[in-house]
């Protein structure tokens, strides 16, 4: 890696920077009018995320509007599933629906090996266009869903309130679930390598539903497979920073640190100062402003950013929300978040 790296990549690598980089999870999406207008013309989420021209355009919308330090691929954690033989649809206001939820060993044995350059070439295309056009004015981010969260979707068949189906599999037929998780870990590792090869400079793993596990079960069904993904990626790209985000992770921070990731993205339910004490010093911190705060006034947003930043001092740090930005968030408040974030200095 040459010098003149973009700010977010420099910070993620632990280099000295003048201010913390700032971006937002789900920064491209429903809170932006320009996105809603485009959605009216292209109502299918899968088309918006799998047509390279549309995905590129949407990925660039927040960059053009707010100039965040990170430009993240517009996609979905379920996007790689069809390449493994699992079809899905995303229904507006209902979320993802899996066509044939996984229930038995035959389905798992019939899963295809993911070959990203074949089934996900549109992702490669978008990332290389972003890398070229963003031109190091920001860092290009890729992302994936972690094995446990993907398994939760494909076993439950949709979003769930209590995850009874996947937990039933975990506690009645653990061997079956481990086989599925292992398949996902290898596939997702390959997918991340493909994203990095295509232009992603930093990548984030979302294990959105791992916070539904007890710490004991996290150590069996989530942590080892996160680590497997990280190991696969680091073997080929040891320098590429990896961020891990789990919603509801306050009870898991020490465990997350053992997966080999470079940065832990915190949700807003943990005090960032406390998190810094619990997470080993070499690991960076990202987060963790409550996205609900962006429904407040500008002063409260600025004040919370200052507090969060001051509590993170002395650490490798990236300013972000503690969850994706919420639909209905006023765009001018998102702008305040980015503008004020960029005024912070070390």
Swiss-Prot record:
Catalytic activity annotation: uroporphyrinogen III + 4 H(+) = coproporphyrinogen III + 4 CO2
Q: What is this protein called?
A: Uroporphyrinogen decarboxylase
NCBIfam families linked: hemE
Q: Which organism is it from?
A: Prochlorococcus marinus (strain MIT 9515)
Site Transition state stabilizer: list residues.
76
Q: Which GO terms describe its biological process?
A: protoporphyrinogen IX biosynthetic process
Q: Which residues bind substrate?
A: 26-30, 76, 153, 208, 323
What's the short name of a Pfam family annotated to this entry? Answer: URO-D
EC number of the protein? 4.1.1.37
Q: Which CDD domains match?
A: URO-D (cd00717)
Which SUPFAM superfamilies does this one have? UROD/MetE-like
Write the gene name: hemE
Give the family this protein belongs to, as stated in its UniProt record: Belongs to the uroporphyrinogen decarboxylase family.
């Amino acid at each position: 890696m040459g010098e003149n790296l973009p700010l977010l990549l420099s910070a993620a690598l632990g280099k000295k920077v003048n201010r913390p980089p700032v971006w937002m999870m789900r920064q491209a999406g429903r809170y932006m009018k320009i996105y809603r207008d485009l959605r009216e013309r292209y109502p299918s989420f899968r088309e918006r995320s799998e047509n390279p021209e549309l995905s590129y355009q949407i990925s660039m919308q927040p960059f053009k509007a707010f100039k965040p330090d990170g430009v993240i691929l517009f996609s979905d954690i379920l996007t790689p599933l069809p390449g493994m033989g699992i079809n899905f649809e995303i229904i507006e206001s209902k979320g993802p629906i899996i066509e044939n939820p996984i229930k038995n060993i035959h389905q798992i044995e019939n899963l295809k090996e993911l070959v990203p350059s074949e089934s996900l070439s549109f992702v490669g295309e978008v990332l290389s266009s972003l890398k070229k056009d963003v031109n190091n004015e920001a860092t290009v981010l890729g992302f994936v869903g972690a094995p446990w969260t993907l398994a939760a979707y494909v076993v439950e068949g949709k979003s769930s309130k209590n995850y009874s189906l996947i937990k039933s599999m975990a506690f009645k037929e653990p061997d079956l679930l481990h086989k599925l998780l292992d398949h996902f870990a290898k596939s997702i590792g390959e997918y991340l390598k493909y994203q990095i090869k295509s232009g992603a400079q930093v990548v984030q793993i979302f294990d959105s539903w791992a916070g539904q596990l007890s710490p004991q079960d996290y150590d069996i069904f989530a942590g080892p497979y996160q680590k497997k993904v990280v190991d696969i990626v680091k073997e080929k790209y040891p320098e590429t920073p990896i961020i891990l985000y789990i919603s509801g992770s306050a009870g898991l921070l020490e465990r997350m640190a053992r997966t080999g990731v470079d940065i832990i993205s915190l949700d807003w339910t943990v005090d960032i100062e406390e998190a810094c004490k619990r997470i080993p010093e070499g690991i960076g911190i990202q987060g963790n402003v409550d996205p609900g705060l962006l429904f407040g006034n500008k002063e409260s947003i600025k004040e919370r950013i200052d507090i969060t930043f001051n509590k993170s001092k002395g650490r490798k740090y990236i300013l972000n929300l503690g969850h994706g930005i919420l639909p209905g968030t006023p765009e001018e408040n998102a702008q305040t978040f980015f503008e004020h974030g960029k005024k912070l200095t070390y």
